[in-house]
Amino acid sequence: MRLTRAESKAANKRALIEAAREVVGREGSKAKLEDIAELAGLTTGAIYSLFGGKNDLMVAMVDDYTSPLDLRSIEAAEPGMPLEEVVAEVARRFLRMSADPQAAGKLLFETRVLDLALNDPELLGKLNASIRSTEVDFAALFSGCEYGGATVTDGQALRLARALKALLSGLGQGVVLGAHDVSEEFFVETAQALITRRVLGLA
C-alpha cells in the first residue's frame, strides 16, 4: 500500500531519529549529518526539510529517547496520597531501571549526548529547555500529595523533583557501573530523607 504524504513524512522522521541515535551513540560530538542521512537512506536535505537542521534533529532525538532513569512512565499519584509513599515508589522504580541489563548501553548514549551538547551552545540551550520541561512532568508526581498535614504545592513539588533526580541519578549510575551493590531499602530511605521543609521550601 502506498503511503500518504503525511505517513511518508512520519516514516522519514522516525528513520532519521533512529539513525541519529545510532550515529551519536557511536560518534558523540563528531556525529555528522551526512552519516545520519546515509544510515537513514535519505539526504541531508531531508534533515533540513523535516527538522530545520542538526540541532532540532538532536533535540527530537533526545525527546524521543526513553532514559533508563526516566520516571515519566510513573502515573501521577492520587490527590492527597502521602508524599513518603510516592517518593518510595519512585525510588524503587529508579533502582529497577538502573539494574536493567540494557541500562549500561543507554547510559553510554546519554554520555555521548552530553558530549555533543557541551560542544554546541545552541543545542545545549535547547536541551536545557527540554530538561526543564521534563522536570515539570516529574514534579507532577508529587504535586497535591499530603505532607505534614498540608498539600504539596507545584513549587514544592518541583524543588523535590530536582533534588530527587540528582540524588537518584547518582545512586543509579553507581548501580549501572557496578560500583555499588545497594538495597531497595537504602534507595527508599535515602530518597525519603529529602522530604524536609528545607528541601520543599515554603508553600
Residue ranges of each PLM-predicted region?
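Amphipathic alpha-helical segments used for helix-helix packing
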Residues: 100-128
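Short, flexible helix-adjacent loops and helix caps
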Residues: 25-29, 74-81, 99, 143-150, ...
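Helix-turn-helix
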Residues: 11, 15, 19-64
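Hydrophobic/aromatic-rich alpha-helical bundle segments in the mid-to-C-terminal region
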Residues: 5, 124-128, 132, 146-195, ...
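Hydrophobic core segments within long, regular secondary-structure runs in both alpha-
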Residues: 84-91, 135, 139, 185-196
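Solvent-exposed, amphipathic alpha-helical segments
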Residues: 19-26, 72-76, 109, 113, ...
